[in-house]
């Protein structure tokens, strides 16, 4: 426990919080190259084959990123844009791939929440 005089001299140091998306190095998004595209199974109460990709970012860090939406065109060596955001039922997946940018196509036949999935407005 410091004395009042020690606090006057030095003050208290702020605690540094833990960054949830360290691989992005403080940027909102980061470009990367897919090294492996595969499916993974979720944690206990859920059951599915979730589409994920191993991505080597421009920050030289390799991360596992989730591919949102139905269907995708990604394969090895595809250029993708990665943002932060974890998938709750996939352990270790703390990033998501942005649909509709670089080599990633938007979701086909998407009517609602189109901007999240890079889908263009269909002509009526």
Swiss-Prot record:
GO BP: any one term: translation
UniProt keyword annotations, A-Z: Ribonucleoprotein, Ribosomal protein, RNA-binding, rRNA-binding, tRNA-binding
InterPro entries given in the database record: NA-bd_OB-fold, Ribosomal_uS12, Ribosomal_uS12_bac
Biased composition (Basic residues): 108-118
Start and end residues of each stretch annotated as Disordered: 105-124
GO terms of molecular function: rRNA binding; structural constituent of ribosome; tRNA binding
Subunit structure: Part of the 30S ribosomal subunit. Contacts proteins S8 and S17. May interact with IF1 in the 30S initiation complex.
Record's function text: With S4 and S5 plays an important role in translational accuracy. Interacts with and stabilizes bases of the 16S rRNA that are involved in tRNA selection in the A site and with the mRNA backbone. Located at the interface of the 30S and 50S subunits, it traverses the body of the 30S subunit contacting proteins on the other side and probably holding the rRNA structure together. The combined cluster of proteins S8, S12 and S17 appears to hold together the shoulder and platform of the 30S subunit.
Family from the record: Belongs to the universal ribosomal protein uS12 family.
PANTHER family: 30S RIBOSOMAL PROTEIN S12 FAMILY MEMBER
Protein name: Small ribosomal subunit protein uS12
Originating species: Mycobacterium leprae (strain TN)
GN (gene name): rpsL
């Amino acid at each position: 426990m410091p004395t009042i005089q020690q606090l006057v001299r030095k003050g208290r140091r702020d605690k540094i919080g833990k960054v949830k998306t360290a691989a992005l190095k403080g940027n909102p998004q980061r470009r990367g190259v897919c090294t492996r595209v595969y499916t993974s199974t979720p944690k206990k109460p859920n059951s599915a084959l979730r589409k994920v990709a191993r991505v080597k970012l421009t920050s030289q860090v390799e991360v596992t990123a989730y591919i949102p939406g139905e269907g995708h065109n990604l394969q090895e060596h595809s250029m993708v844009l990665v943002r932060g955001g974890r998938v709750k039922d996939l352990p270790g997946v703390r990033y998501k791939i942005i649909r509709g940018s670089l080599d990633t196509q938007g979701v086909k036949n998407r009517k609602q929440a189109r901007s999240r999935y890079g889908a263009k407005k269909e002509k009526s």
